Design a protein with these regions (language model features):
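Non-catalytic accessory regions flanking glycosidase/transglycosidase catalytic cores in CAZymes
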Residues: 1-106
C-alpha cells in the first residue's frame, strides 16, 4: 500500500449546508424552507426524519467553532439559510437571522 501525504501547505477545512446543520427550524423568525415543507409532509421522508434539530448548530455554534479550532481547521465554508434571513422570500429582513451569521463570522 502506498503512503500518501498532503503537502505541508495544504489548508484543512470543513463545509456545511444550513439545513443539515443549523436546526432551529422555526426559531427567531425563520421562515419555512422547501426542505422544511417537504420533510414535514407525511410519507415523504423515511421515519418522518426532519432537519428540525439537526446538529443544533444555531444554538451550539460556539462549541462547533471550538471543535474546528481543536481539529486545526483553517477554513470553514457554510451556506446561508435564506428563510432565516428573508422569512417570506422577499421584503422584510429578519434581524435575528442576520445576527446569527454576524456572530458566526465574527
Amino acid at each position: 500500500m502506498n503512503n500518501y501525504r498532503f503537502p505541508s501547505n495544504f489548508t484543512w477545512g470543513a463545509a456545511t449546508a444550513s439545513y443539515q446543520i443549523e436546526g432551529a427550524w422555526n426559531a427567531d423568525g425563520k421562515g419555512e424552507s422547501i426542505w422544511d415543507r417537504f420533510a414535514h409532509t407525511p410519507g415523504k421522508i423515511t421515519n418522518g426524519d426532519t432537519g428540525d434539530v439537526a446538529c443544533d448548530h444555531y444554538h451550539r455554534y460556539l462549541e462547533d467553532i471550538a471543535l474546528m479550532r481543536q481539529l486545526g481547521l483553517k477554513a470553514y465554508r457554510f451556506s446561508v439559510s435564506w428563510p432565516r434571513v428573508l422569512p417570506t422570500g422577499f421584503g422584510r429582513v429578519n434581524p435575528a437571522g442576520l445576527d446569527f451569521y454576524d456572530r458566526l463570522t465574527d
